[in-house]
Each structure stands twice: as C-alpha cells, then as structure tokens.
C-alpha cells in the first residue's frame, strides 16, 4: 500500500483528497496535517471528510508524522509548500504538488528539489485538463499566427490567485508551440482605449464568482471561424483523483520534477 499524507487536510480540497485516497485501491491515508492554529487538530481525518473514523488523527506538524508516509500531497499555498518541500527533500519523501501561484524563482526551487526526490507538480491534476493541454499544443501548431488567442477562466469567489495556474499553463503551452515567450506576449485584461489587437499577444480574462469549481476556455479566433477548447470541472474530486493517481505512479520513480503529462504518458 502506498502510504499517503495530505497537507491542509481540514480544508475543502484536503477533505476531498482524503476521500479520494480512501477510495483508491493501493492507496491509504496514513497522515493528515493542517495549520498549527487549527481548532481541528486531533480530530479523526475520516470524520473531517465525512467518511467515519479511520484512525488517522489530524496533526499540526509534518515532523511529527515523518515516519508515517511515503508521499505528501500538498494543495496549499506557495509559502507552505516550499517549507514542506525542504522537509521532504531532507527526509527523502516524494511529493505531489497542486499548489498554484508560484513565482518563476520559486518554480526553480521545485526543479532543484527534483534532483533529490521524485515530484509531480501540475497546475491541474484533472485528466481532462491535461488532455486539453495536448489538444492546445496541436491546435496552436496548426493554426499558427493566423488567429487571435484568448484564454478565459472562471473560479469560485474564494480563489486568491489570478489568472489561475491552469490558465497560465495553457498559455505557456500555446506560446511554446508558437515559439513565443508568454511573459512577453501575455495581456491580462483590457480597459479603455487599447487600440487594435496585436495578433502576437495572448489575452487572459478572469472571472471570480459563486462556487464555480473551474472553467477554462481557449479561443482561437480567425476571420470567418473560431475554435474553442473548453474544460469545465464540476467537482474537486476530479483533481483529487488525479493527484492520487500521480502518487501511485511515483512509486519507484527516480528523482525528477514530473508533471501530469508524464503520469498520463501524453508526451
């Protein structure tokens, strides 16, 4: 059995991850961790996820459960994830990282850690989204510079980063396929007298509203026709199942920084 720990276990995504782990053959939740100031520390992780008692108590410190897991799943905040990364690197623990909002410099720290431990880092662990990335690469290469490209994403009102990590990853895939640098061609929102559109740019539009789990559309617009590639998530479980799938896939892998394209063999 693959022994899995979940960081941020008392949060919405954490509870969903607990459920996904418990539903997956070959996986078992052996540790659950949350903030030191959480009033839920000491509670049974299964009860937090409405699964009933499973005998795993919520801890407030990763170090306290260091001997109880093989791989840590972390969907938290960059500052938290980087601390956990240092811990896992020191103790030889594999990591699944679904945290978004990393800077370029912080992503480099993930790459450095990948020299010592196996890591799967992805902006989105949904199988559908990762298949969409493959389709976006194909579409961009075929349509080339003959289209305007816009990326529209929507998430719930509590999401703190914008654009979403998934939208940015979609932009990177499209830009790379076209030989462009996303940092140079990205346009984040438009207002006022913007002038005619530069076809080399890739636009981003963000919606934050209600309880939207995650919608992403990439629009390729030409004269007389347009192509839209859309993914809509209706449940966090799709991300959680992908993360657990990645945790099982990592078993026995050499140290490296992998992503879901590797897990799904889409390269």
From Swiss-Prot:
<dbReference type="GO" id="GO:0008839">
    <property type="term" value="F:4-hydroxy-tetrahydrodipicolinate reductase"/>
</dbReference>
<feature type="binding site">
    <location>
        <begin position="165"/>
        <end position="166"/>
    </location>
    <ligand>
        <name>(S)-2,3,4,5-tetrahydrodipicolinate</name>
    </ligand>
</feature>
<dbReference type="InterPro" id="IPR000846">
    <property type="entry name" value="DapB_N"/>
</dbReference>
<dbReference type="GO" id="GO:0016726">
    <property type="term" value="F:oxidoreductase activity, acting on CH or CH2 groups, NAD or NADP as acceptor"/>
</dbReference>
<keyword id="KW-0457">Lysine biosynthesis</keyword>
<feature type="binding site">
    <location>
        <begin position="98"/>
        <end position="100"/>
    </location>
    <ligand>
        <name>NAD(+)</name>
    </ligand>
</feature>
<comment type="pathway">
    <text>Amino-acid biosynthesis; L-lysine biosynthesis via DAP pathway; (S)-tetrahydrodipicolinate from L-aspartate: step 4/4.</text>
</comment>
<keyword id="KW-0520">NAD</keyword>
<keyword id="KW-0560">Oxidoreductase</keyword>
<dbReference type="GO" id="GO:0019877">
    <property type="term" value="P:diaminopimelate biosynthetic process"/>
</dbReference>
<dbReference type="Pfam" id="PF05173">
    <property type="entry name" value="DapB_C"/>
</dbReference>
<feature type="active site" description="Proton donor">
    <location>
        <position position="159"/>
    </location>
</feature>
<dbReference type="GO" id="GO:0051287">
    <property type="term" value="F:NAD binding"/>
</dbReference>
<dbReference type="InterPro" id="IPR023940">
    <property type="entry name" value="DHDPR_bac"/>
</dbReference>
<feature type="binding site">
    <location>
        <position position="34"/>
    </location>
    <ligand>
        <name>NAD(+)</name>
    </ligand>
</feature>
<feature type="binding site">
    <location>
        <begin position="8"/>
        <end position="13"/>
    </location>
    <ligand>
        <name>NAD(+)</name>
    </ligand>
</feature>
<dbReference type="GO" id="GO:0005829">
    <property type="term" value="C:cytosol"/>
</dbReference>
<keyword id="KW-0521">NADP</keyword>
<feature type="binding site">
    <location>
        <position position="35"/>
    </location>
    <ligand>
        <name>NADP(+)</name>
    </ligand>
</feature>
<dbReference type="GO" id="GO:0009089">
    <property type="term" value="P:lysine biosynthetic process via diaminopimelate"/>
</dbReference>
<comment type="similarity">
    <text>Belongs to the DapB family.</text>
</comment>
<dbReference type="InterPro" id="IPR036291">
    <property type="entry name" value="NAD(P)-bd_dom_sf"/>
</dbReference>
<dbReference type="GO" id="GO:0050661">
    <property type="term" value="F:NADP binding"/>
</dbReference>
<dbReference type="InterPro" id="IPR022663">
    <property type="entry name" value="DapB_C"/>
</dbReference>
<keyword id="KW-0220">Diaminopimelate biosynthesis</keyword>
<comment type="function">
    <text>Catalyzes the conversion of 4-hydroxy-tetrahydrodipicolinate (HTPA) to tetrahydrodipicolinate.</text>
</comment>
<feature type="active site" description="Proton donor/acceptor">
    <location>
        <position position="155"/>
    </location>
</feature>
<protein>
    <recommendedName>
        <fullName>4-hydroxy-tetrahydrodipicolinate reductase</fullName>
        <ecNumber>1.17.1.8</ecNumber>
    </recommendedName>
</protein>
<dbReference type="InterPro" id="IPR022664">
    <property type="entry name" value="DapB_N_CS"/>
</dbReference>
<keyword id="KW-0028">Amino-acid biosynthesis</keyword>
<keyword id="KW-0963">Cytoplasm</keyword>
<feature type="binding site">
    <location>
        <position position="156"/>
    </location>
    <ligand>
        <name>(S)-2,3,4,5-tetrahydrodipicolinate</name>
    </ligand>
</feature>
<feature type="binding site">
    <location>
        <begin position="122"/>
        <end position="125"/>
    </location>
    <ligand>
        <name>NAD(+)</name>
    </ligand>
</feature>
<dbReference type="Pfam" id="PF01113">
    <property type="entry name" value="DapB_N"/>
</dbReference>
């Amino acid at each position: 059995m693959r022994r899995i720990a979940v960081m941020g276990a008392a949060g919405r995504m954490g509870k969903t991850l607990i459920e996904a782990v418990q539903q997956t053959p070959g996986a078992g939740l052996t540790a659950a961790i949350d903030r030191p100031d959480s009033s839920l520390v000491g509670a049974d992780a299964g009860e937090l996820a409405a699964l009933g008692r499973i005998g795993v108590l919520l801890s407030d410190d990763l170090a306290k459960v260091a001997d109880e897991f093989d791989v840590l799943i972390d969907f938290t905040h960059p500052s938290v994830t980087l601390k956990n990364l240092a811990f896992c690197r020191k103790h030889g623990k594999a990591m699944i990282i679904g945290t978004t909002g990393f800077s370029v410099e912080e992503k480099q720290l993930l790459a450095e850690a990948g020299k010592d431990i196996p890591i799967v880092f992805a902006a989105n662990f949904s199988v559908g989204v990762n298949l969409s990335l493959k389709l976006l690469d194909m579409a961009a290469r075929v349509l080339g510079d003959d289209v305007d490209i816009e990326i529209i994403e929507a998430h719930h009102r509590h999401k703190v980063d914008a654009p979403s990590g998934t939208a940015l990853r979609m932009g990177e895939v499209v830009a790379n396929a076209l030989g462009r640098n996303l940092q140079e061609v990205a346009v984040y929102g438009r207002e006022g007298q913007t002038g005619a559109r530069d076809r080399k740019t890739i636009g981003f539009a963000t919606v934050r509203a209600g309880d939207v789990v995650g919608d992403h559309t990439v629009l390729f617009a030409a004269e007389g026709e347009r192509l839209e590639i859309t993914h809509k998530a209706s449940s966090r479980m799709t991300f959680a199942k992908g993360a657990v799938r990645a945790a099982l896939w990592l078993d026995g892998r050499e140290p490296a920084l992998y992503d879901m394209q590797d897990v799904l063999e889409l390269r």
